[in-house]
Amino acid sequence: MKSFKPLIIIFIFLLTGCVEKQILDDINILTGIGYDLTEENEVMGTVLIPIYEADQTINNETITDISEPNKDLVSTVQKKATDPIVLGSIENVIFHRDLTEQGIIQFIDGLQRDASVGTSLYIMVSEDPTVDILSGNYGNRSTASYITNLLEHNMKRRDLPRTNLHVFLNDYYQEGKDPNLPIIGLSDGKLGITGVGILKKDKLASTIELR
């Protein structure tokens, strides 16, 4: 019987691995969200889902839909997804500049109330439509990872103030403190940081260009 124990253990590990792979293959892991204003002054939400292919390449799939501040965007776009969308691995949330000027706390409040969302995720403002940024191709890594690395690299160099969801909320609720957010934009198809946005409470009030 002892000689069979190693074989049984190996079989259990193989079976567990197959189950985990099947579960991952049957869900869409959301890694980024973008919010834009339409010409009708409606909010259009975009979710980013990396699709990992068998040849180890990554295709970035986006799904868009009209979003209301008091409704969950993920629940809305679920109707357009082929597999269930899960929120636990979100890295970035991007707000178009026009929307940020109107106020974004209702969207951020929804994120902080979701127990599956970590407070280390990055929030930022975009000069270009967020749907264009999230749909972009930035090399052989996922779009969310590219944006995360872009921000963290510049924060380590101190070209950007350190900020994330946790820092933003602390600044927002602290009396006399103005939150700041990175501003990103596209130039000839390349994504970069263009400046820092200073907010009065949750509304973009002024910007500082990076040189």
Where do the PLM segments sit?
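Membrane-proximal alpha-helical signals and transmembrane carboxylates
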Residues: 2-9, 13, 17-211
